[in-house]
Amino acid sequence: DKSSLEWISNFFIKAIGIKNKYSNKEKFFNNIHRSLNISNLNDFRMDIINKINSSKSFREKFYKVSKPLVDMVVGNEVVMQKRVSLSIQIPKDDSSLLPIHADTWSGVSPFESVIWLPLVNCKKTKSMFILPPNKTKKLVKIISNKKIKNSGDLYKKFKKDLHWIDIKYGQ
């Protein structure tokens, strides 16, 4: 649903609250990190999350954008969590990066599906990575045997096996 995607994109520009001095949305989102103070990143993120969750339309628009994929992957009998969350990664800022992980490691149901909606074209380290199934089995075995103590070491061990997803705006 292109109109819902545009609505979400415009919502974020307004929620961010920084004057858009760029000629288009893609340039705005690709350069917003230049206007952010990394030490205030979590406060910035929480402010946007609060705006998202205060919006009467955001969840509906988000669902409309993702509905074709959600229906295909999990069917049409779904429940959406009450609160939408947001992750922000800043270029060259290790403190904002998400380490190699599975949401189930922190108690999330293995039956939950997470939707990532890119507001710009993403590739390489601007994207998200996945680990092929055969390597995932190896990773699970290593974790089960407690051979690696933290996600940083886990990342180093599997870095060469990661597949970075190329994904376009709204895909």
Where are these predicted regions, by residue range?
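Generic, low-specificity signal for short hydrophobic/alpha-helical stretches with a mild N-terminal bias
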Residues: 30, 48-52, 82, 97, ...
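Active-site periphery "cap/insert" segments of enzyme catalytic domains
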Residues: 60-61, 88-91, 95-99
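A short coil-to-beta-strand element that immediately follows conserved catalytic motifs
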Residues: 76-85
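Catalytic core of non-heme Fe(II) oxygenases with the double-stranded beta-helix
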Residues: 96-169
